[in-house]
Amino acid sequence: MLPLGVTMFGERVADVFHPGDHGTTFGGNPVCCAGAVNILSRIDDRLLEGVRERSDYLRRTLQAAPGIRSVTGMGLMLGLEIDIPAREFAERALREGVLVTTAKQKIRLLPALNIPMELLKTAAQALVHCAAE
């Protein structure tokens, strides 16, 4: 894994930052940038359709689960508002073999865009179990 941080701005705010005004620990590394260019060149309609399919499945499954109040986000980058403390949910998920992160009282899901559907289904069922436990 190569760390890379990116910040993008639209035209409305483009004149706010000038070279040297904003930096990031993971920004500008030539090796990481070369890796990012390679990955971006691999994004195609087939990959994006797979992301839509996986996202739809994950949303449907989690929205129907008792103990999960809401599912928000875009694509496979999702946030779960849950009935129990986020840390407790994260610990349950880890015991089930699913690594999640927390943000205040939300659970953050960030699976790989190309996660195999069977693995995603296994993880989703584990999360449903964690919410209902």
Which residues are covered by each model-predicted region?
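Conserved N-terminal phosphate-binding loop of PLP-dependent enzymes in the Aspartate aminotransferase
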Residues: M1-E133
